[in-house]
């Protein structure tokens, strides 16, 4: 990638990529940090083109510098990046982010501004009696003191723009309440009403907020009734529910109640609490899914499930103890079976980091492939595949022919190969040399050419049938027929050898004696 997609030219980009993120660190700035900063600028109502010039970077620093001490990590990272860009535009050599921050504080006089924000211009610190200082210690927002009077400072368009974009993107999600708390810090009821009036859409949600405001205002009037009789001249009246809501009070009266009244009534903070209650009702309406319904899918990564779970916990209108109990009991209970087995093996009360580390990769395609490979390996090693459709009794585990142990075959046997006879099963000789099972002719089984007879070992076996009575031989029809054929054959041989003299059919020509005469 080149410098065409960044806020710097090629020479400035080379210098930018030599600056380290931390002192003595290995990581350095890259072009992806500039792209990330351009996307982050929209959240603060700033245009990304401001990063391309020195004046634009100074304007960004003026906006972000008041928020930097109490800002989030993303906001601090953006502020540090803009300070580095300002040094690059000013062609000042810096090695890391810390040096850039020190140079920016000096050139932009941020140290002097921080001191003047706490100390009045006269150089002498006044006492808090008489209402000369704001409750937060700063006199820049939402009002400034000029002489003995307080002057209202309206909200900046950037703040209103950030609020509108947050509502449009989140649609009254769980993030809206902390976003409103951050943007309305120290505001007067007039400023808060201005934040609500700039919302063109979501009028249904705003109507819910107005109903909550009316209920809280009525409750305030009941608990804080106005004093009977006329007020003394010059004394400020006590605020009512409509005064706190900003409908029957002016901006100057609101400032006097907050800063100069005796006793003081922070109408801005009270009205802010009412708005937060209404926004919490809107969040519950726009997020009807309860934390009890959040369950991990069979193929959902555990990290995504945790994000959805804590988002639902954030939207729940419950105390901290109840949310803690929900987290401890439901997070593991509603996980899928694969993650649940792993989480239960971690013991009692595992941390979220331990759970995320243990379930990393569970449910993904790689994890499924790994489990399938292990299952196939176990099936192959045990040889439990049923042939013939699974009919009959299951086969026993395989037995090794080499060592005689169960659980593996001969090709998987770890012991050295032994010479063993296939007939008798004894080691030391082959089947062709086996003398264990031979017949009475001296031949064993499977020796091909000679007739197969019963083994010699079975000739002397006792018969299982009882002996015939009187030691007589049992009748055998086959044996009887064989004897008849033998006798008949003997008679025919005798007749051919000695022909009868009185037989007229006998012809000597049929005999071989006629061929040789008396020589035979």
UniProtKB/Swiss-Prot annotation:
A motif (PTAP/PSAP motif) lies at residues 463-466. A motif (Nuclear export signal) lies at residues 16-22. Keywords: Capsid protein, Host cytoplasm, Host nucleus, Host-virus interaction, Lipoprotein, Metal-binding, Myristate, Phosphoprotein, Repeat, RNA-binding, Viral budding, Viral budding via the host ESCRT complexes, Viral nucleoprotein, Viral release from host cell, Virion, Zinc, Zinc-finger. Residues 117-144, 454-520 are annotated as: Disordered. GO terms for biological process: viral budding via host ESCRT complex; viral translational frameshifting. A zinc finger (CCHC-type) spans 398-415, 419-436. A motif (Nuclear localization signal) lies at residues 26-32. PROSITE patterns: ZF_CCHC (PS50158). PANTHER family: ENDOGENOUS RETROVIRUS GROUP K MEMBER 24 GAG POLYPROTEIN-RELATED (PTHR40389), IGE-BINDING PROTEIN (PTHR40389:SF3). Matrix protein p17 targets Gag and Gag-Pol polyproteins to the plasma membrane via a multipartite membrane binding signal, that includes its myristoylated N-terminus. Also mediates nuclear localization of the preintegration complex. Implicated in the release from host cell mediated by Vpu. This is Gag polyprotein. It comes from Simian immunodeficiency virus agm.vervet (isolate AGM155) (SIV-agm.ver). The gene is gag.
